Structures are given as C-alpha cells and as structure tokens.
Amino acid sequence: MDDKQAMHAMSIDDAYHVERTLARGPSGVTELVSIDGNGPFVRKKIPSPLAQRNVWAALSACQSNRLPRVEATYELPDRFVIVYDYVPGSTLAQIAEENGRLAPNVAVQLIDQICEAVQELHQHGVIHRDITPANVIVAQDGAHLIDFGIARIRSEASNRSRDTTALGTYGFASPEQYGFAKTDARSDVFSLGRLLEFMLTGVYPDASDYEQRLADDAAVPARLRAVIGYACAFEPSKRPQSVQEFRQALFSQSNPPIPNASSANPPSTRTTNGSASASRLFRRLH
C-alpha cells in the first residue's frame, strides 16, 4: 500500500462516527458506527495477517437477508476493515437464558431460517464453523447468522486430510474441527443439529448427561430427536451430506436413519430453565 492509498483509506475510516465499541481482542476491534446520518453499521478492524479476505468477498456476493449485508471493505496500513449492516435483536443464547427451551415449532422455524443462511454460504464456498447460540441474532424478521471469525473457504484442491488447528465453540464444533478430519459442509450440518438440540432442551451440549437427557425428554418430539442424531453423527459420512438434506430430514414425515455412533462431549452443567411458548417468541419474531 503506497502513501496515497493509505491516506485515502484513512479518510474513509475517519468519516465514520463511532457510537460505541462492541468488542475488542487479539482478533481485532468491532464497533457500532454511523456515517452521514446513515446507520448504524458494524465495523470490524481485523489485523491484516488474520484477515480472511476471501471469506468476506464471498459474503459480499451472498443475497440471503439472513446474512450480514457488506456495505464496504477497505485496507488500512495494518488492518483490514469491513463495514456491514447492524441487526438489532437478541442472541439465541440470551433468549434461552431468559426463557429456557423453545417450543418445537418455534425451534424448527428458527433452525430453518439459519439453514437458509448456511446453505447460501455453502453455495459460495464458505464453511462457517462456529454456528452457536451466541452467533445467531433473533430480530423482528427472524434469525440472522453472524460472526465469521473462523469461517474459511472450502478448498477442494487441498491435500490436507484434516484440520490442523482446533477452532470452534466446544459442544457445537464438529469432531473434524478437533483434527479428526477436514471440515466441509457436513461440519456445519453437525453444528446445526447441536443448535437445534440446544433450542429444544435449553441445555448446552457439553453436559455429561446431555445426550441421555435428550433421549429421555418427552417434550422433544421423537422425530426431531432422530433428526438431531442424524445430523450429529460422529462420522461425516453418516450425516446429511448437505444443508438441503438436513432441511429435507427436518420436514420429512418419516424418521431419518439413526447412526450407529453419536458424538460425545466431556462434562459441564450449564442449563437454562423454563419453557417459552410459541406465541411469546413469535412476538419477538414479528
């Protein structure tokens, strides 16, 4: 970057008014900003060596309103900057903390909306790898998927047989993300299954008795338990092979195949209490 380019980028950067800082850490700074009376927007400043420019370029091409709409990208001397639309709402983690488990019809509606976002990402070659309650915003128009900090572009040409760095949120990350295999679309399918399970139970998937509690939970329809088991099979080949297949299983009237082996997690005891009715959550959605 020459001096002229740097000055131009800094003039763009200075045009934004910072409303408040949303997050700050080794991976960069996230701010709520406005410009010329427009906004608010989210602005992320990522250290240049950590910037996944190809992921953000792919996201810019996505059309789903369940994904952030990228407004601008530019380069500072030591930062890659992305500006995208801000979606007001509550995360699924916050909703579960406040209300507990969701009614099955509400959980299915939300997971299908998240599937729409993930399916669009996959069509543009992006694997999200961090589909969690904290990374789903529920706004007036439904669910939105956020946080692309560990997303990557799927590389069919790569010679690697497995991921070399363990990344993801424990309990929601697929086994591949811990070095068992190479992540692909089926890794996000695993996370979608875990997320559906969380919405239906209000229990984080790192409890020692998590799977047994799901199996014994009469409030969760047996067909949805089967869908979750299918999506969360340890072996990627035993899962739905795409988000589209997962959605088909979700709405099918017949039970999906049950894998011989499920995934397992070490202990934790994080739970939420209570049950949110469909009408209560739909007031959030509409």
Regions found by a protein language model. Name each.
Residues 239:
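Conserved HRD-motif arginine in the catalytic loop of eukaryotic-like protein kinases
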Residues 122-138:
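Catalytic-loop of the protein kinase fold
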Residues 63-72:
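Conserved HxN/HPN-centered segment at the entrance to the catalytic loop
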Residues 24-53:
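ATP-binding glycine-rich loop module of kinase domains
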Residues 110-111:
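Activation segment signature within eukaryotic-like protein kinase domains
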Residues 77-91, 95:
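Conserved short submotifs of the Hanks-type protein kinase catalytic core
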Residues 161-176:
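Conserved activation segment of eukaryotic-like protein kinases, specifically the C-terminal portion
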